[in-house]
Amino acid sequence: MTNTSRPVLNLDLDLLRTFVAVADLNTFAAAAVAVCRTQSAVSQQMQRLEQLIGKELFARHGRNKLLTEHGIQFLGYARKILQFNDEACASLMYSDIQGTLTIGASDDTADTILPFILQRVTNVFPKLSIAVSIKRSAEMTDMLQQGKIDLVITTSNNDDLPHVLLRTSPTLWYCSADYQYQPGETVSLVVLDEPSPFRALALDQLTAAGIPWKISYVASTLSAVRAAVKAGLGITVRSVEMMSPELRVLGEEEGLPKLPDTRYYLCRNPDHDNELTNAIFSAIESGTRSHLLPVSTGTESELREPPTDESLKDIT
C-alpha cells in the first residue's frame, strides 16, 4: 500500500551527476568543466536539486562548496544511483562482448585500485576473461606501447596515450613506527632501483629543500621497500595507499617538504585499438566521471596516525 502523504521523488540523473562532480571538485567552476556545462548552469542545477529534496546540500562559505551533513549523506546515495544506472546501461550494451582483456598494474595498485577496476569490468562485461600482469610502472608502459597488454594502471601520465584519471592521492614520507628522525639530520632513504618516480621525487624534493640525504637501501620490489622501512632502515616516499599500522608519517613538522599528490591513470594504446579494449576503456571512463574512485583526502596531521583495518577499506 502506497503512503500518499509522502510522495516519492524521482531524482534527475543529470542533477546527480553534476552534484557528484561539485562534491569531488569543490567548486562550481571545476564541476562545470567536468560535466560540460556553464558555471551558471551548474549553479542552477544545484538549486533545483536542493529544492527537489528540500535540504541544503552545500555550506555557503566562499567559492569552495563544502557539503553539509545532508550533502554528505546524499553523496553516497548519488554515487550508488549513478553506478547502478551506468552499469545497467553498459551491461545491456556490452553483455555479448567476449574475449580476454590483459590489464597491467604496478605493485602499489595491485591491492588497492586494481580490485575496484576488476569489479567494475566484470560487472559490465560478465562474459569477459581477464589476465592481470603486475610489474613496475615503466615496464608496464613499455608493454602497453608494444601491444603486449591492453590497459595499464600507472602513475605515469603519458600525454601521447589516451588516459583516464582514476584517483588523486596524498604522497607521504613514511618510516617505521619507532623510527627516530631529528629535523636537519641526513635523511636515510629506502628506494626502489631506477627507474622509479617516487625515488626521483624524494631526491628532487630533498635536494630542492637543501636537506642532506643518502640512500641506505635499494630494493627491486615494493614489498622489499615495505620490509626495509618496517625494519627501521630508513624513510621512503609513497602514496597514501601504502599506509599500514606498522608505519607512521613524517612531514613538515619534522622539516621535510610537503609532497605533490600522486595521480593514478588508466591508459590504453591507440595504435593497438580493438573493439574489446575500446568498449572497456569507454565504460571505465564514463564511470570515473560520476562514481569511481573518489579523491583520497585528509590533512597531513590526519594521516599521521596508522589507519585501522576498517578505515583501510575506504581506500579500495
From Swiss-Prot:
Question: What keywords tag this UniProt record?
Answer: DNA-binding, Transcription, Transcription regulation
> Can you provide one Gene Ontology molecular function annotated for this UniProt record?
DNA-binding transcription factor activity
List the InterPro entries hit by this protein, alphabetically: LTTR (IPR050176), LysR_subst-bd (IPR005119), Tscrpt_reg_HTH_LysR (IPR000847), WH-like_DNA-bd_sf (IPR036388), WH_DNA-bd_sf (IPR036390)
**Matching CDD domains:** PBP2_LrhA_like (cd08439)
**Keyword check for Flavoprotein:** no
Listed Basic and acidic residues bias regions: 301-316
The question of whether tRNA processing is a record keyword is answered with no
Q: Where is this region: Disordered?
A: 293-316
Gene3D superfamilies linked? Periplasmic binding protein-like II, Winged helix-like DNA-binding domain superfamily/Winged helix DNA-binding domain
| All copies of domain HTH lysR-type, residue ranges | 11-68
Per the record, DNA-binding region residues lie at 28-47
Q: Which PANTHER family match?
A: HTH-TYPE TRANSCRIPTIONAL REGULATOR LRHA-RELATED, TRANSCRIPTIONAL REGULATOR
Functional note = Regulates pectinase gene expression.
Q: Which family does it belong to?
A: Belongs to the LysR transcriptional regulatory family.
Q: What protein does this entry describe? A: HTH-type transcriptional regulator PecT
Protein species of origin: Dickeya dadantii (strain 3937) (Erwinia chrysanthemi (strain 3937))
Phylogenetic classification of the source organism: Bacteria, Pseudomonadati, Pseudomonadota, Gammaproteobacteria, Enterobacterales
* Annotated gene: pecT
